A protein has these predicted regions:
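Positively charged n-region of N-terminal signal peptides that target proteins for export
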Residues: 1-4
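N-terminal phosphate-binding loop and flanking beta/alpha elements of the actin-like ATPase fold
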Residues: 7
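PEST-like low-complexity, intrinsically disordered acidic/proline/serine-rich tracts
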Residues: 26-139
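N-terminal signal peptide c-region/cleavage motif recognized by signal peptidases
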Residues: 14-16
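Boundary at the C-terminal end of the N-terminal hydrophobic targeting segment
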Residues: 19-23
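Short, linear, compositionally biased motifs with a strong N-terminal bias
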Residues: 10-11, 30
């Protein structure tokens, strides 16, 4: 019985540490690398455990960079007032503020989205998640 309890405890701890690593902001994103990216939405993926937005960003030379942004899960976006088919749609030009991936790829954890008309919606966790950094840029 003691051996079974010990093995169960080890398996539980192994699973817990893997879950915590998956949900660690600083494991994937750099709290010191804030980004503000403007582009055109190409796709909105409402999927658990995290929603994703994809943008085409036109560089000064005319080439296109593709960016992926992670956000709240769908149920949290809906509770924050998002509408699945109208809040963010392909073709919209937006500016997304967030934190860049540690590996330097065109991946970021989004915090807020600003639309062409100036209104802003929250797409990610509140202040402090970026390793205690300022969550929203000041205008």
């Amino acid at each position: 019985m003691k051996r079974a309890s010990f093995l169960f405890g080890c398996l539980f701890l192994a699973h817990t540490s893997a879950s915590l690593a998956h949900h660690s902001f600083l494991a994937e994103y750099d709290g010191d690398k804030q980004v503000t990216i403007t582009g055109v939405v190409t796709e909105v993926d409402w999927r658990n455990p995290h929603s994703h937005f994809y943008l085409d960003v036109t560089k000064p030379d005319g080439t296109i960079d593709k960016w992926k942004f992670e956000a709240f899960p769908p149920n949290m976006l809906l509770r924050n007032g998002w509408k699945r088919d109208t809040t963010l749609k392909p073709g919209m030009k937006v500016t997304i503020f967030g934190w860049r991936a540690r590996d330097g790829s065109n991946l970021a954890h989004s915090r807020q989205i600003t639309f062409e008309d100036g209104h802003v919606i929250v797409s990610g966790p509140p202040a402090g998640t970026g390793g205690g950094r300022t969550a929203v840029p000041t205008p």
